[in-house]
């Protein structure tokens, strides 16, 4: 069986560990083959991916799911990475999402996509040391998802009534264990005033998407806490955001733990100016850089059944 899952951008300003948006910029492919066996055995294959089960988000999530249902099988798991890792695009989450979605289909577990999030998020332990559900939820469910509870996990898809595209500015800045490092930079204590400001941003963002109000979304795509604390990881961001707003983007934010910047644009935005000048900012910082123009995507899907 072949299953695919799309990339995603998490946080979206003030929605740290709450919001993530699935988009069609990139996709991961999982090929999974299962045979009857007296014991559970998983073999990982793929170029440029960890082959150890406990170091690979897809195999780690798959193992958690199969153990929970006491499934014994010989599994061959081939991972074809289309989503670049370490750039804030939900790479590890997409692989984990595709793996558990495939297992659910093969073993006819009849679990909902929401139920699968509980297992897919465990795969993030392999990549970042903590089981955060935002990216995996987006890749599994599709669209914009909000994490409403973490134990037990509850996620809901947020209605999107605004037409937009996402310009992803992708600098090739490689930081060892970046997601783990970025999570360690999150402040343990914050001023109440900053908390209130962020809560207002998050409310504005959600209302903007639901009501189709670009000005509310623009206000909501801000953050006074996490992005500020992590700014040393992506010094290019403030200038790119400034340029984006100058040329009437809906808004801009750091995609996940960065360094990718997500710029939300529509028919009012000067996309060419935004793109050209944003790429120039990356060059000024000495970064090799590329871009993608993406649309909101659906969740994981089966491409081929064997």
From Swiss-Prot:
It is an enzyme of class 2 (transferase). NCBIfam families: PRK01212.1-4, thrB. It comes from the Archaea. GO terms for molecular function: ATP binding; homoserine kinase activity. Belongs to the GHMP kinase family. Homoserine kinase subfamily. Its EC number is 2.7.1.39. It catalyses: L-homoserine + ATP = O-phospho-L-homoserine + ADP + H(+). One of its GO terms (biological process) is threonine biosynthetic process. GO terms for cellular component: cytoplasm. This is Homoserine kinase. Keywords: Amino-acid biosynthesis, ATP-binding, Cytoplasm, Kinase, Nucleotide-binding, Threonine biosynthesis, Transferase. Catalyzes the ATP-dependent phosphorylation of L-homoserine to L-homoserine phosphate. Disulfide bonds: none annotated. It is found in: Cytoplasm. ATP binds at residues 84-94.
């Amino acid at each position: 069986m072949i299953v695919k899952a799309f990339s995603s951008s998490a946080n979206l300003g003030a929605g740290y560990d709450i919001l993530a948006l699935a988009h069609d910029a990139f996709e991961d492919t999982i090929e999974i083959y299962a045979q009857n066996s007296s014991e559970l055995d998983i073999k990982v294959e793929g170029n440029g991916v960890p082959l150890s089960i406990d170091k690979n988000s897809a195999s780690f999530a798959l193992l958690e799911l199969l153990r929970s249902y006491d499934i014994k099988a010989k599994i061959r798991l081939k991972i074809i990475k289309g989503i670049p890792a370490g750039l804030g695009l939900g790479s590890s989450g997409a692989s984990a999402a595709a793996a558990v979605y495939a297992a659910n289909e093969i073993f006819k577990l009849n679990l909902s996509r929401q139920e699968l999030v509980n297992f897919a998020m465990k795969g993030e332990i392999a990549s970042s040391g903590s089981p955060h559900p935002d990216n995996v939820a987006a890749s599994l469910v599709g669209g914009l998802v909000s994490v409403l509870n973490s134990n037990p996990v509850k996620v809901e898809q947020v209605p999107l009534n605004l037409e937009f595209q996402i310009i992803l500015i992708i600098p090739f800045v490689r930081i060892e264990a970046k997601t783990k490092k970025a999570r360690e930079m999150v402040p343990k204590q914050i001023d109440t005033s900053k908390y209130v400001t962020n809560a207002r941003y998050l409310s504005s963002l959600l209302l903007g998407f639901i009501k189709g109000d670009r000005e509310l979304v623009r206000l909501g795509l801000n953050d006074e806490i996490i992005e500020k604390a992590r700014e040393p990881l992506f010094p290019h961001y403030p200038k790119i955001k400034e340029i984006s707003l100058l040329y009437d983007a809906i808004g801009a934010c750091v995609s996940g733990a960065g360094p990718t910047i997500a710029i939300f644009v529509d028919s009012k935005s000067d996309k060419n100016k935004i793109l050209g000048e944003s790429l120039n900012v990356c060059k000024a910082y000495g970064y090799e850089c590329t871009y993608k123009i993406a649309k909101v995507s659906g969740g994981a899907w089966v491409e081929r059944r064997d």
